[in-house]
Amino acid sequence: MDTMDTMGRHVIAELWDCDFDKLNDMPFIEQLFVDAALRAGAEVREVAFHKFAPQGVSGVVIISESHLTIHSFPEHGYASIDVYTCGDRIDPNVAAEYIAEGLNAKTRESIELPRGTGSFEIKQRETKAL
């Protein structure tokens, strides 16, 4: 893991070719996100998820260190996720990878942005076949 002198790290990930049923299962996604936060070492504070008709789930897990979010589009096999952590104690990539694996994403494209350092440049771009 690269260390950064930053107030936070923000992973933005595009997950493609995910399992339709998992993307449309709100209780599953909620538990997956709570587990991802805990696996990364975060402290969960609040959880809010919403199931859309006919399909799709959006939600947020508020952690002491910031948040994890998802917007799922089962009809496209796609989910957009954000994992933002403050400080350098927690690696947001741990949670993002756990989520991608849990949704059976075939492809994950992500970037990591340092936050709170003024002007920023993209520190990492990764496309990964899972």
From Swiss-Prot:
Residues the record marks as active site: 66, 71, 86
GO biological process: spermidine biosynthetic process
UniProt cofactor note: Binds 1 pyruvoyl group covalently per subunit.
Family of the protein in this entry: Belongs to the prokaryotic AdoMetDC family. Type 1 subfamily.
GO cellular component: cytosol
Name the record gives this protein: S-adenosylmethionine decarboxylase proenzyme
Modification after translation, per record: Is synthesized initially as an inactive proenzyme. Formation of the active enzyme involves a self-maturation process in which the active site pyruvoyl group is generated from an internal serine residue via an autocatalytic post-translational modification. Two non-identical subunits are generated from the proenzyme in this reaction, and the pyruvate is formed at the N-terminus of the alpha chain, which is derived from the carboxyl end of the proenzyme.
Quaternary state and interactors: Heterotetramer of two alpha and two beta chains arranged as a dimer of alpha/beta heterodimers.
Top-rank lineage group of the source organism: Bacteria
Modified residues (Pyruvic acid (Ser)): 66
Biological role: Catalyzes the decarboxylation of S-adenosylmethionine to S-adenosylmethioninamine (dcAdoMet), the propylamine donor required for the synthesis of the polyamines spermine and spermidine from the diamine putrescine.
Site (described: Cleavage (non-hydrolytic)): 65-66
HAMAP family: AdoMetDC_1
Cofactor: pyruvate
Pathway: Amine and polyamine biosynthesis; S-adenosylmethioninamine biosynthesis; S-adenosylmethioninamine from S-adenosyl-L-methionine: step 1/1
EC number(s) given by UniProt: 4.1.1.50
Reactions it catalyzes: S-adenosyl-L-methionine + H(+) = S-adenosyl 3-(methylsulfanyl)propylamine + CO2
GO MF annotations, alphabetized: adenosylmethionine decarboxylase activity
Upper lineage: Bacteria, Bacillati, Bacillota, Bacilli, Bacillales
Alphabetical keyword list: Autocatalytic cleavage, Decarboxylase, Lyase, Polyamine biosynthesis, Pyruvate, S-adenosyl-L-methionine, Schiff base, Spermidine biosynthesis, Zymogen
